[in-house]
Structures are given as structure tokens and as C-alpha cells.
């Protein structure tokens, strides 16, 4: 089960107590306290995570609540911690952010010159991890697992990969968010400049493979190729979403807004 808010988790835990033996929680790499030692393992301490704001705090609170329930014998708990999930029909404006702008020949702004490393996982690998965890409670119970493809990629590299798959040129514009007056202390997915953070997120997913036999086999290129195949089948492409921070930066640079 997933939850954006810890009170959702509290309600679910109360409702399921005595009714289920194993609770698999869909968590996030946003629970980890920022560290300059990469990759982050499951033993990396919990936040606070300033970049993720309330989202990270609520995921941490949810996990703490569930681990308390596990310790009390309410049910077994497994936490699956994901980075950014990609795949066809993604409701989050990730692939669609890049594809729409690339096909329209629009500039894509890259905070910090796009050097930040981020990590992804394909939706089918996510599903495989969830199913496997539920099928192996004797191993997965009481454990947390990162689930991510092993090779991170820079933000610039990710956009260039999207452009290569589409067969178009990328119009990349490196920016300094602070200098343009559009910097933000926390991530607000309703008001972005770029869909991924400007701080490294790199997880170690080897425990998932070692203990549960789950391999995140779909690499960065194939993730984009699978999305591109879905994208090309859409009679009406997802509309470009407009963001105030992105438009403010474009205006400051003298570029047309979305």
C-alpha cells in the first residue's frame, strides 16, 4: 500500500490490524537523510530531507509508524523504496515533460547545468518487486529494500537520451535558479523548472536482488524507448503543462513561455 500522508497509513494500519499478516509499504528514496556517500543503502539514516519537504517527512512518519506496528507484532512489514518511476501512461509529468518540449522544439532548462545524478526504475520492475515481496513474507518481512536500476544518469544525459530516442535535437539551456530568482527550498511538483531534483539521488538496490531475486533489468534507454512506443500510439499527445517557475525563468532569459 502507498500513502502520501502518515495519517492515511495510520488509518490503514488500524483497519488492517488482525486482518492481514503482511503489509508491503510503497515508500521512497525521499526518506533518506542527505549524504555525500553514494549509493544510499537501506541502512542510511532517515531524514529530515529538506529538498523533499512535507512529502519526505510524511514518508518517514509512515515508515516509523509501520515499523512500530511490526515490532508490536501487529503484522509483518516490508518497505520498498523507489526513486523515480518511469513507464507508459505515466501520470507524473516526467517523460511527457521532455517529450512534449523536445517535439515542439522548445528549450528545456537545466538547473546546475544538468550535472545532477538521478536514478530511475521501470514500472514493470516496480510491479515485480511488489509481487515478489508479497510472495516471500518469510524473507521480506521486517526488511526495507531499495528498488532502482543500478545506473544513475545526469539530468542532462536523461534529456539527451530522450532526444536521441525521438530523433530530434535538444535545445538545452543551463541555468542558475538563484540568479534568475526562481530557486525553491523544497520540491513542489505542481510548480517546477525541471521534473527532477538538482541534488543527487542514488540508491543501492543490490539487497533486493540478493535476498528476493528481483533484478531491475530495464535500463535507462529501454525505459525511454518503451515510453516513446506508447507516446507514438497516442492520437492526442499529453498537453504541455505550464509551470509558473519555469515560465518565470524563461521570461528572465527572454525566451517564450509555455
Predicted regions and their residues:
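NAD(P)-cofactor binding segment of oxidoreductase domains
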Residues: 1-40, 50, 63-68
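Conserved sequence/active-site signature of Rossmann-fold short-chain dehydrogenase/reductase
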Residues: 31, 85-87, 126
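Short-chain dehydrogenase/reductase
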Residues: 38-64, 92-96, 119-120, 152
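A short C-terminal helix-loop "cap" of Rossmann-like NAD(P)-dependent dehydrogenase/epimerase domains
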Residues: 45, 99-111, 168-173
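Conserved beta-loop-beta element that borders a ligand/cofactor-binding pocket
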Residues: 63-89
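Hydrophobic "lid"/C-terminal helical patch
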Residues: 66, 130-134, 162, 220, ...
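Substrate-positioning beta->alpha
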Residues: 92-98, 111-135, 142-143
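Mid/C-terminal beta-alpha module of Rossmann-like enzyme folds, strongest
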Residues: 133-193, 205, 211, 225-226, ...
Amino acid at each position: 500500500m502507498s500513502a502520501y500522508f502518515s495519517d492515511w497509513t495510520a488509518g490503514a494500519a488500524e483497519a488492517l490490524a488482525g486482518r492481514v499478516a503482511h503489509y508491503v509499504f510503497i515508500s521512497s528514496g525521499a526518506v533518506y537523510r542527505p549524504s555525500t556517500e553514494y549509493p544510499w543503502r537501506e541502512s542510511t539514516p532517515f531524514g529530515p530531507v529538506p529538498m523533499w519537504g512535507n512529502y519526505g517527512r510524511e514518508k518517514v512518519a509512515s515508515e516509523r509508524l509501520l515499523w512500530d506496528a511490526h515490532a508490536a507484532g501487529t503484522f509483518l512489514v516490508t518497505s520498498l523504496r523507489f526513486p523515480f518511476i518511469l513507464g507508459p501512461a505515466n501520470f507524473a509529468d516526467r517523460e511527457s515533460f521532455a517529450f512534449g518540449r523536445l517535439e515542439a522544439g522548445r528549450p528545456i532548462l537545466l538547473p546546475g547545468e544538468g550535472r545532477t545524478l538521478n536514478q530511475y526504475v521501470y514500472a514493470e520492475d516496480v510491479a515485480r518487486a511488489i509481487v515478489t515481496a508479497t510472495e516471500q513474507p518469510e524473507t521480506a518481512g521486517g526488511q526495507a529494500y531499495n528498488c532502482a536500476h543500478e545506473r544513475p544518469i545526469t539530468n542532462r544525459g536523461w534529456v539527451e537520451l530522450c532526444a536521441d530516442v525521438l530523433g530530434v535535437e535538444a535545445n538545452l539551456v543551463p541555468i542558475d535558479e538563484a540568479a534568475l530568482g526562481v530557486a525553491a527550498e523544497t520540491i513542489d511538483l505542481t510548480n517546477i523548472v525541471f521534473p527532477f531534483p538538482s541534488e543527487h539521488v542514488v540508491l543501492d538496490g543490490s539487497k533486493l536482488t540478493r535476498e528476493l531475486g528481483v533484478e531491475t533489468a530495464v535500463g535507462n534507454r529501454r525505459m525511454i524507448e518503451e515510453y516513446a512506443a506508447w507516446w507514438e500510439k497516442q492520437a492526442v499527445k499529453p498537453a504541455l503543462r505550464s509551470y509558473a517557475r519555469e515560465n518565470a525563468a524563461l521570461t528572465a532569459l527572454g525566451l517564450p513561455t509555455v
